[in-house]
Each structure stands twice: as C-alpha cells, then as structure tokens.
Amino acid sequence: MADYTEEDKQKVLAQLSKKTWKIPELAKILKMDKKVVKKIVQDLINEGVAGYWSSGSTTYVATKEYIEELEKKRAEG
C-alpha cells in the first residue's frame, strides 16, 4: 500500500523526465520527505518507468527515456 498520492507520484515523474537526480536533491526541490520520494522512485522503477543511471562515480535516477538519451549521447562521445 502506497503512502503517497497519485499527485505526488506525478510530481516526481515530471522531475525525473527533465534530468537525472539524486534522491535527496529531488526530495528537497519537491519539498517532500526523502523516504516518500525514495518509495515513489522505487515504485516507478518497479513499473519500468524510471531507472538508475551512473555517471561513473554517482548513481542517479531518471525516466527510462531520459536515460536512453543520456546513453545515446555518451555513445556518440
């Protein structure tokens, strides 16, 4: 059972589609509890909508589409 609203989920999803985020940063700009944001992100990952992306030293989260764009740019150099 989720302890967040569909509106909360949509806010997180909207931000994840714009750029990569570390969960604490995402929680801060959304003014939401970090645990709630982490739960929403995990649910989005489980649904196949979001995913993790690593810069090599740091792990971020974003939508699958945004991650695909980043990987394409990375491959192109």
Swiss-Prot record:
SUPFAM superfamilies the record matches: Winged helix' DNA-binding domain (SSF46785)
Coiled coil: none
Top-rank taxon: Archaea
Alphabetical list of Pfam families matching this protein: DsrD
Biological role: May play an essential role in dissimilatory sulfite reduction.
Sequence similarity: To D.vulgaris DsvD.
Protein's recorded name: Protein DsrD
Naturally occurring in which organism (per UniProt): Archaeoglobus fulgidus (strain ATCC 49558 / DSM 4304 / JCM 9628 / NBRC 100126 / VC-16)
Lineage: Archaea, Methanobacteriati, Methanobacteriota, Archaeoglobi, Archaeoglobales
Gene transcribed to yield this protein: dsrD
